[in-house]
């Protein structure tokens, strides 16, 4: 990326650029010696588009919607988008299945893949489980470990149903391993709902 003159130092704080496309404040700014900074990659005019195997066609104009984005953080760590683009290519990953909360960031990874002459894998973005307030279920909303539930099998069956997989009635008497084996054998990607989120029952993410 540096050989292509696509990188430049950025001294902006997160607070000053949060919630809006980066305007290029530091694009033509002279480097400041001995000052902590992140590294941004220049984006280009035009749209990045791909067809998600679940959500369908997705298109984004990086320059207008995102702006130049960070590929190396001020603390010296490489940013997620660059790390996964390179790591997936190194491992020969051909298919990526993940939550729909990462759908909008995918064009940034594809852009880096293109600039680095890496193969772009196929993407499938599943709807994420959320609370009734559209908060992603996680430790932050007191989500409970599946295996800590009184009947974890019910959660697995419930999840399969919400993902459009139509679990067999016989699974009500199955154990966790048997349910997962059924899911692997009968998984049908075309039946997964084309939506970004699915509201989960409150007992699955709150202890009280």
Task: List each language-model region with its residue ranges.
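Alpha-helix boundary recognition
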Residues: 2-3, 161
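Polyanion-binding catalytic cores of nucleic-acid enzymes and NTP/SAM-utilizing transferases
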Residues: 146-150, 155-208
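Active-site cores that bind ATP or allylic diphosphates and position pyrophosphate for catalysis
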Residues: 3, 9-148, 167, 194, ...
């Amino acid at each position: 990326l540096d050989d292509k003159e696509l990188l430049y130092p950025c001294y902006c704080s997160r607070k000053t650029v949060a919630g809006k496309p980066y305007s290029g404040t530091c694009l033509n700014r002279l480097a400041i010696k001995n000052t902590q900074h992140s590294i941004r990659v220049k984006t280009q005019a035009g749209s990045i588009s791909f067809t998600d195997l679940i959500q369908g066609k997705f298109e984004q104009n990086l320059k207008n919607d995102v702006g130049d984005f960070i590929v190396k953080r001020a603390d010296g760590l490489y940013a997620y988008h660059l790390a996964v683009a390179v790591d997936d290519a190194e491992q020969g990953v051909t298919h990526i299945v993940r939550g729909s909360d990462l759908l909008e960031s995918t064009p940034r990874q594809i852009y880096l893949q293109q600039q680095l002459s890496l193969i772009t894998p196929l993407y499938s973005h599943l709807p994420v489980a959320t609370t009734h307030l559209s908060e992603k279920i996680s430790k932050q909303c007191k989500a409970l470990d599946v295996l800590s539930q009184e009947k974890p099998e019910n959660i697995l069956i419930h999840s399969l149903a919400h993902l459009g997989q139509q679990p067999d009635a016989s699974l009500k008497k199955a154990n966790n391993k048997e349910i997962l084996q059924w899911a692997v054998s009968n998984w049908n990607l075309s039946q997964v709902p084309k939506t970004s989120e699915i509201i989960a029952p409150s007992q699955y993410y709150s202890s009280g």
